[in-house]
């Protein structure tokens, strides 16, 4: 949120610099993302008074002699502008000056005449008419007659200001306004807060009745409206235009500007309905009907449902509650009567409607964080005061204030100074705590027994209990008063990565070496993702923990598998034109012992890998598995297993030391056909997935490092091309080969071939064998005997022939 320094000064007598205030705000829990000086990029630009002018013959230029005070009383500068006259004061960028955008001004010749700088327009200084009148004229910016030559230009044109870009956290909706930040600044500096004027007087009766009703008080706890007649559209005063411009808004008209100004200043969204366009002069706050439509002020049409709250007239919706008004009831140059609305809408309703429709606004941003029920009264009063002050219309006596019946009461918290200090872990003087709370507009009633009855301001809905009071105290008292200490239960460590973290890092590096990139997904999805994988209802993966307040229905359960998230990432990549890739994710899944949960679920660390692309195959994923096995000095075995989402003939379960680690294989043809991707992608894509229980994998790893010397003798490799039945698995062949001799240290599959020349139901698999002996050099005879034994075992056990 952008907050001008000059606007804050209207509410608080600030006696520190903007930079000092930035530090104080940060120390009190407000993150100033950026402190923006308005004169950024401007240097050595001063007020210059034109004392001589002469047209330069044969050119469009005018030679000027400019009085720049202490910088020189007769500086010669040529300009192409024609809107100035003798005696005018204008911005003069002198030799060596800079302008916004990194523009550097140097003395140079223009059409053969020396020019020692540049006379500037408002645009060249980054100004517009809302910031300084006359800035958008074609030509030079003409300054006030009483401007003093040689004065720095910034204070003359209002560029001696700063914008605080503050990140407002979700628990402080009361700070979503200039007044809200000013309130905090007043407390920080120990200064009084000067509230904006909110007095007004009704001057006439309504010319006709208006009906206002709220059918959904659960979604609209308070709805206020006031009727104003004889609307007089016009231009806003300079101060209001400047306020809006500093916050990034352009002035439109006096009445529209008042609604925007109230939003920025008070944090209260408001809307004005043109009563001449409101059918039946009726306003009804209700849930939308199924299929009802509205066109908003930005000319977008939306189809609504009962989950959306709308403001309606006697015939149709005229506004999306808390988000944006309808185009059918907006102000224009013919508007003569307005109904001003200020309300409190349920934050969840506004958030869900905004997300569902993809429609956001400054109003919805504030309602989503929360607007307290007292805010509409203050916001409406401020707006009506401005209506009267700027003579925009005649305020009538007709006003509505509809509530859900709940009383507007301050929250009371009974506590003791000892409790607050106990939370902080330090002793803060009682009177200091009382002073801090009172500066923050809390009231503290000290009881006879020494306890405190503290009442929170109406706008502080985030304050619920005494730890919240402790937070308020320490924010103002200073976190630097808390001495760093160890927890009683804490153990001292040497720092750095622990064993588990090192193993995770090693795993990631092993996969990265195989060409895999790390993915990171949300910890929740929906049952639709499990449906997509054809997971049966009785499967343990269906025993998912439901979120009570999901961000959306698509994110309504805690994940029990990583594979659905990985498949979503792959599909998103394919939709965006990424035709190939290798990904992995290491993250927990959440497994409940029973539902509904009665204890914390087990967060089981899991590893998921995915590969997609026309050239990817089964052995891409198997190669990743083997890389993990080799990296951790393990031996994996593979067995056939049916998995709902994997191809029955191109998948396997992974085992280590008798433990089942997980599964991997090709996505089933049926699921591949159901993916929301183009048909040509479905036909050409190969998608392979694998998911391992990472905790089970790590339980197989021997954490003790042992020295294993390299053999001083050369290893020997032999390749075997074997023909076997389709039903014979790669794992069976590898296992048989390894058991033939202790000299065989490694077996790798490097090719699979199927063809008519092999015969029906046959395939060829080519393996590379590595033979090594750490104690002696292997002879050719040993190699031949070993290979012969391998082939004999393969033929006897599996019926395999050499090709």
Whereabouts are the PLM-identified features?
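Conserved mixed alpha/beta core segments that line enzyme active sites in large multi-domain catalysts
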Residues: 33, 47-78, 246, 259-328
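Beta-rich nucleic-acid/ligand-interaction surfaces
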Residues: 39-43, 200-202, 455, 491-492, ...
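Mobile "lid/hinge" segments at catalytic clefts and subdomain interfaces of large enzymes
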Residues: 114-130, 135-140, 154, 162, ...
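Phosphate-backbone binding interfaces of nucleic-acid-interacting proteins
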Residues: 1-202, 206, 339, 358, ...
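A carboxyl-terminal module marker
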Residues: 2, 20, 438-442, 462, ...
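Glycine/proline-enriched, intrinsically flexible loops and inter-domain linkers
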Residues: 5, 23, 53-55, 189, ...
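Extended, well-folded interaction surfaces typified by the phenylalanyl-tRNA synthetase beta subunit core
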Residues: 413-579, 718, 770-774, 782-803
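Terminal amphipathic helices with adjacent charged low-complexity linkers/tails
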Residues: 185, 189-214, 391-420
């Amino acid at each position: 949120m952008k907050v001008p320094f000059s606007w804050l000064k209207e509410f608080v007598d600030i006696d520190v610099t903007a930079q000092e205030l930035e530090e104080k705000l940060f120390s009190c829990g407000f993150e100033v993302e950026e402190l923006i000086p308005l004169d950024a990029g401007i240097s050595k630009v001063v007020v210059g008074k034109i004392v001589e002018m002469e047209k330069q013959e044969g050119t469009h230029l005018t030679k000027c002699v400019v009085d720049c005070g202490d910088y020189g009383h007769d500086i010669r500068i040529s300009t192409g502008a024609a809107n100035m006259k003798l005696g005018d004061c204008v911005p003069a960028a002198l030799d060596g000056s800079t302008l916004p955008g990194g523009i550097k001004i140097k003395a140079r010749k223009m059409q053969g005449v020396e020019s020692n700088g540049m006379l500037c327009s408002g645009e060249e200084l980054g100004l517009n008419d809302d910031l300084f009148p006359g800035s958008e004229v074609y030509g030079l910016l003409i300054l006030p007659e009483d401007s003093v030559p040689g004065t720095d230009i910034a204070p003359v044109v209002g560029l001696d200001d700063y914008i605080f870009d503050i990140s407002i956290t979700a628990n402080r909706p009361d700070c979503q306004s200039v007044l809200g930040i000013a309130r905090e600044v007043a407390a920080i500096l120990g200064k009084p807060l000067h509230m904006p004027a909110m007095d007004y007087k009704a001057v006439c009766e309504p010319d006709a009745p208006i009906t206002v009703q709220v059918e959904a008080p659960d979604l609209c706890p308070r709805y206020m409206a006031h009727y104003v007649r004889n609307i007089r559209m016009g231009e806003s005063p300079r101060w209001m235009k400047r306020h809006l411009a500093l916050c990034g808004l352009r002035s439109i008209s006096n009445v529209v500007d008042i609604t925007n100004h109230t939003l920025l200043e008070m944090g209260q969204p408001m809307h004005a309905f043109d009563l001449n366009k409101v059918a039946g002069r009726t306003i009804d706050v209700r849930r939308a009907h199924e299929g009802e439509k509205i066109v908003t002020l930005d000319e977008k049409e939306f189809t609504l449902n009962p989950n959306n709250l709308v403001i309606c007239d006697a015939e149709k919706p005229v506004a999306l509650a808390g988000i944006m008004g309808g185009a059918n009831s907006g102000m224009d140059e013919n508007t003569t009567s307005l109904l001003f609305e200020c309300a409190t809408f349920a934050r969840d309703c506004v958030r869900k409607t905004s997300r569902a429709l993809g429609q956001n606004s400054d109003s919805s941003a504030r309602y989503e964080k929360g607007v307290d029920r007292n805010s509409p009264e203050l916001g409406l009063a401020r707006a009506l005061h401005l209506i009267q002050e700027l003579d925009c219309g005649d305020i009538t006596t007709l006003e509505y204030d509809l509530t859900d019946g709940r009383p507007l009461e301050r929250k009371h918290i009974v506590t003791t100074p000892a409790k607050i200090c106990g939370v902080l872990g330090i002793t803060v003087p009682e009177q200091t705590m009382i002073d801090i709370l009172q500066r923050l507009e809390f009231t503290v009633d000290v009881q006879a027994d020494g306890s405190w009855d503290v009442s929170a301001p109406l706008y502080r809905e985030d304050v619920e209990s005494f730890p919240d009071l402790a937070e308020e105290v320490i924010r103002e008292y200073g976190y630097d008063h808390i001495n760093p200490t160890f927890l009683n239960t804490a153990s001292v460590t040497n720092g750095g990565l622990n064993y588990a973290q090192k193993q995770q890092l090693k795993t990631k590096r092993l996969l990265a070496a195989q060409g895999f990139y790390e993915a990171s997904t949300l910890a929740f999805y929906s049952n639709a993702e499990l449906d997509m994988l054809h997971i049966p209802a009785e499967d343990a993966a269906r025993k998912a923990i439901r979120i009570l307040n999901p961000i959306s229905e698509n994110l309504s359960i805690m994940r029990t598998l990583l594979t659905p998230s990985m498949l979503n990432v792959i599909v998103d990549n394919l939709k965006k034109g990424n035709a190939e890739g290798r990904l992995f994710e290491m993250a927990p899944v959440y497994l409940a012992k029973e539902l509904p949960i009665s204890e914390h679920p087990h967060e089981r660390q899991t590893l998921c890998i995915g590969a997609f692309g026309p050239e990817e195959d089964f052995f891409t994923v198997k190669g990743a598995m083997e890389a993990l096995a080799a990296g951790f000095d393990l031996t994996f075995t593979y067995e056939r297993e049916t998995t709902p989402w994997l191809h029955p003939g191109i998948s396997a379960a992974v085992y280590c030391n008798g433990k089942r680690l997980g599964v991997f294989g090709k996505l089933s043809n049926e699921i591949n056909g159901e993916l929301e991707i183009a048909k040509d992608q479905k036909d050409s894509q190969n998608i392979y997935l694998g998911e391992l229980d990472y905790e089970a994998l790590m339980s197989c790893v021997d954490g003790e490092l042992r020295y294993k010397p390299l053999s001083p003798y050369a290893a020997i490799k032999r390749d075997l091309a074997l023909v076997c039945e389709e039903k014979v698995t790669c794992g069976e062949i590898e296992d048989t080969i390894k058991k033939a001799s202790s000299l065989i240290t490694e077996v790798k599959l490097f090719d699979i071939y199927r063809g008519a020349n092999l015969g029906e139901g046959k395939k060829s698999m080519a393996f590379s064998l590595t033979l090594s002996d750490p104690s002696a050099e292997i002879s050719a005879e040993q190699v031949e005997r070993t290979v012969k034994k391998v082939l004999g075992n393969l033929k006897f056990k599996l019926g395999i022939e050499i090709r």
